[in-house]
Amino acid sequence: QVRKAVWEKLSLAEVHRDLISSAKPRIMFFREIASRLSSRGVAVSAGDLNLYSLQLTVQRYIVSRYLEQQCPDILPNLLDAAGISPGSTSLEKFAGTFCRLFPGTEFIEDPTLDPVSWIKADGDRLKLLVSEILILSVAASNKALESFREVIDWNGLLLESSAQEVVEGVESFLTAAPPVAEFGLTLPEILRLPLKAAPLSLFEQLKFMKEQWRQLLPEELLPEIMAAFTLSEEEGRMFMPHGDHEHTAAVLEFGGHTAGSGTNDYYPEPERFSSDTDWMPNVVLLAKMVYVWLGQLSKKYDLEITRLDQIPDAELDLLAEWGVTGLWLIGLWERSPASQHIKQICGNPEAISSAYSLFDYAIAADLGGEEALWRFKEKALKRGIRLASDMVPNHTGLYSKWIIEHPDWFVQLDYPPYPAYRFTGVDLSSNPDISLHIEDGYWERRDAAVVFKHYDHRDGRTRYIYHGNDGSSTPWNDTAQLNYLIPEVREAVIGTILHVARMFPIIRFDAAMTLAKKHYQRLWFPQPGHGGIASRPEHGMTRSEFDAAMPEEFWRQVVDKIATDAPDTLLLAEAFWLMEGYFVRTLGMHRVYNSAFMNMLKLEENAKYRQTIRNVLEFNPQVLQ
C-alpha cells in the first residue's frame, strides 16, 4: 500500500529488488523507507512501518477468510453494489486508477502491465481489490498512521468521483452483509475495532488483533507478529539514554523454571561439580594491572622495570608474606593496536589498548615475551605463588589475527543492518590485506553502531561484523564478536584455552556468562518475539534450530577438556546474571564471581543478600564451597 509517487520519489524499486535478490529480512525495506524519509525531514519509525505491514497482513487475512469461507457467494453482489461488476467499464476505470496510484510490486517491476488484464487473469484478484479498498478506507481514519501518512495517503484516489462511489458502495454493502460469525459484528466494524481500542498506537492495535482475533489467525503468522513487537521495542531502547532506569539486584533463586513455560530458555541443571586439587581451596588471589604495576614498582624501587622478569624478588617476597598464593596479571597478552588508535583519536593521547581487546594469545613483546614470563613464573612458584591470566573467549580485538585469517568466524552480515550507517573514517587495520572502519557515529559521538566494516582486499568482499556486546550498554567498539554456532570457532577457542592452561595454572574467563547457551541465543539469535542485541531479532532462531547448531554447552566442553588435558588448572568464571549456581554446579567451573554480593553490597541490600545465601544453602550447600 505504498503510493506510486513515494516509490518513485524514494527510489524504492531498487531497494525492493535488492531485498529480494539478497534475501534480506523484510525489516530492511522499512528501514530504508524510514531512512530516506528522515533524510527529507520526515521522522518515521521503521518499527511502525513494520507494525503496519503486519496489520495489513492480518486485515487481508480476515477479509479473505470472510469472502472465501463464510460468504463465498457474496462477491458478485458486492461488486454490483460498488458499481464495478466484472466486464464493466467502471471496473476498468477504477482498476486502472487504483493500480496507477497504489501499484503492487508487479506493476513496479513491469510498468507496461495492464491492470484490467492482470485482474482478469485470476479471479481471486477481484477479492484482493475489494480487500485493498476496504483496508485503505479503514486506514484513512487511523490516527496512528500520521507520521507516515504520505506513504499511504489515498486522497488522490478519492478525487476521482467514481472511485469515491466505489469505496462507499463497498462499505455500505459490507455494513449490511452478514456479520463475521465469530464476533457478531460486520466486517467494517471488526476492522475498525483496533483503532477504537488504541487510536494512537500501532503497537497496541496489532496487539489487540493478536489477542482478540487469535482464533482466526494462522499459526505461522504469530512469530512474525511477535518479531514485529520485538523490533518496535528495540527501536524504543535505542533512543533511551543508558542508565536512565533504576538498577536493582535480584535475589538468587532455584527451581523456578519448568521446561516449556514462557520463553523456551530452560536448560537441564544436572549436578556435575568439578573437584578441587589440593592447592585450589587455599588460593588467595591478588589482581594486578600489569603495566600499571610495573610503573608503580619502577617508582618504588627506583629502577626501570618494564619486563616481567625484572620484577624484584623483594616484591614477590612481600606478596608471599601477605599470604598471596595467586597473582592475576591483567594485560599480558598481545593487544589489538586498533583499540589504542580509537582511544587516541577520541582524545586520549596517552591511552594504550584495552586488555580485553586482543590481537593474539602471545605474551606481549614489550613485557619480555614468553621467555620473561617463564622466568618470572619460576621465581613466583618458588614462593608458593601461582600465576593467573585472563582468557577472553567472547570476542577478539577489532584488529586481530583471526580477523585477518578467519573473517568468517565472526557474527556478521553482508550489508549494514541500519541504512544510515556510514564508514568513512580512518582505516584501523595494520595489515594491507584488509581495511577496518568503525561507524562514523563513534567519531562524531552521536551513535554507537553494532557493526564495523571489514573490507578484504584479497577477494573484494565487504563484511559488516558485529562488535562484542553483552547487551547491557553500548557495544565494545574495539572488539569483534565470535560466532559460536560455527563448530570450528568452538574448537579453535578450546584450543586457545588449552594453550593458556599450559602457561597458567589459574585462568579467569572474561564475560563467561555471555557464552552460556541461553544467553548466547538471547543476545545473538533470539527466539521469535524476544529481543537481543540491536538488529539481531530479525536473525533469530527457534530453540530447536539453535540447539541443532549449538548442541552442547560450550563451557561444559571446556571443563571436560581441561579435566583430561590440563587437570591441575583452576577455572574461574566471570558469570553474572544470576548464573553463579549453574556455572559451578552444572558447568563445572571451580570458582565463579559472586555478582549478588557485589551488587547488593553496592546497593546496601543486606536483606536480599541474606535471602540469597539461604536460598543457596537450601538448594545445594556445595555451591558455596
What is each residue range found by the language model?
Residues I311-I345, H499-R508:
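Catalytic domains of carbohydrate-active enzymes, especially glycoside hydrolases
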Residues V324, L358, R386-A388, T479, ...:
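Extracellular structured ligand-interaction cores
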Residues E334-R335, N394-H395, L578:
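Solvent-exposed loop/turn segments at secondary-structure junctions
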Residues W328-I330, A388-V392, D510-A512, L572-E574:
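A cross-family glycoside hydrolase active-site/sugar-binding cleft signature
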Residues Q1-I305, A364-K377, K382-R383, G397-Q625:
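Alpha-amylase-like alpha-glycosidases and glucanotransferases acting on alpha-linked glucans and related
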Residues E334-L387:
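Aromatic-lined substrate-binding rim segments of carbohydrate-active enzymes
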